[in-house]
Amino acid sequence: MSELIVKAKKLKQAASQLAMLSTEEKNNALAMIAEALIAQTGYILQENEKDMEIGKENGLSPSLLDRLQLTEERVQQIADGVRQVVDLPDPIGETIEQWTRPNGLILKQIRVPLGVVGMVYEARPNVTVDAASLCLKTGNAVLLRGSSSAIHSNKALISVMQQALKQSKIPTDAIQLLEDTSRETAQQMFRLKEYIDVLIPRGGAGLIQSVVENATIPVLETGVGNCHIFIDDSAQKEMAIDIVINAKLQRPSVCNAVETVIVHKQWPYIKELLETLHEKGVELRADKQLADTYPFVHEAKEEDWATEFLAPILAVKLVETVDEAIEHIERYGTKHSEAIISECNEHVEQFFARVDAAVLYHNASTRFTDGEQFGYGAEIGISTQKLHARGPMGLRAITTTKTLVYGSGQVRK
């Protein structure tokens, strides 16, 4: 029997036990995980360094290495994320709606776990803990399939969490790492309907497309982030420049970083914006007018408008109207996060009404599209689809509903 089937069976059994636990029992287990992560930071960093060395030897890009790397501070942040999940209200068992029918039947819709969640993700070890903590809080067992580039880090994190669970009421089998990272085993996982209730892919476009196209299990699709900021002609100079710098440079390798800035031609501070970005080391790829005007600006190619750079590279486009900006976003956006910087309420309302994305911003950075920033605690992913969940997915996104019907002998006539 393969590793996949053995672990999937254990997860299915663990899920039924996990669903019966109280909020207090789940919270106690999560608190133990947070403590264990801090206590075992040295071991975790030692294993992460193995992945980093192999990644450098294999020529991983700086953005992928950044996602892969763990530091003492990042492990602390991961543990803090688990503690935040402890503090969040438990959605399991909550009554969503209750009503009585004319025949006396009382119906109550409640929130329940999904069962077994399958996570498929790339070189981001923090996802291992984020996903596990959210799943355990909501009574779900979780099968984690990370990338081969993070295998030592993921094995260390799972080992630390499972050791912590031994002191709790949560079965250690409730979190499992699929150590076989081969494509063939991944394809089998995508079709394991008998054991897995939902798949959640987190990663690049290739990974997400592979899961969506090959899975027979329902998929909660997370999307790539080709995010835009539109600077309207009324935008305040300092605000616009600060927001663009933050959205591009605070952490360029993440999906909520801005990739294209669209600027109204009548905005008077284009020169200052471009010079500031250039001084901060951003490679600028813009339309011909800007490339001809500024020697440090490269002319953009068609594919640049559709690229999630995940690096200090920014596409810049000039437009004459808010309509033109919206049309550009409609053509190239990935329905993730889009922003408008403007003092014109009419333009903001138009932008909010017409742009189709999970999260829209007015006068704020796209970097806030994040479960923790939204107050959800650690997120399971950012959904760009429209069914079941959209935007940063917190606890409620990995639950489903059950309707309880209370009768007194009613039969249907």
From Swiss-Prot:
Keywords: Amino-acid biosynthesis, Cytoplasm, NADP, Oxidoreductase, Proline biosynthesis. GO terms for molecular function: glutamate-5-semialdehyde dehydrogenase activity; NADP binding. It catalyses: L-glutamate 5-semialdehyde + phosphate + NADP(+) = L-glutamyl 5-phosphate + NADPH + H(+). It is found in: Cytoplasm. Pathway: Amino-acid biosynthesis; L-proline biosynthesis; L-glutamate 5-semialdehyde from L-glutamate: step 2/2. It is an enzyme of class 1 (oxidoreductase). One of its GO terms (cellular component) is cytoplasm. Its EC number is 1.2.1.41. Its main location: cytoplasm. InterPro entries: Ald_DH/histidinol_DH (IPR016161), Ald_DH_C (IPR016163), Ald_DH_N (IPR016162), Aldehyde_DH_dom (IPR015590), G-glutamylP_reductase_CS (IPR020593), Glu-5-SA_DH (IPR012134), GPR_dom (IPR000965). Signal peptide: none annotated. GO terms for biological process: L-proline biosynthetic process. PROSITE patterns: PROA. Catalyzes the NADPH-dependent reduction of L-glutamate 5-phosphate into L-glutamate 5-semialdehyde and phosphate. The product spontaneously undergoes cyclization to form 1-pyrroline-5-carboxylate. PANTHER family: DELTA-1-PYRROLINE-5-CARBOXYLATE SYNTHASE (PTHR11063:SF8), GLUTAMATE SEMIALDEHYDE DEHYDROGENASE (PTHR11063). Belongs to the gamma-glutamyl phosphate reductase family. This is Gamma-glutamyl phosphate reductase. It comes from Anoxybacillus flavithermus (strain DSM 21510 / WK1). The lineage of its organism: Bacteria, Bacillati, Bacillota, Bacilli, Bacillales. The gene is proA.
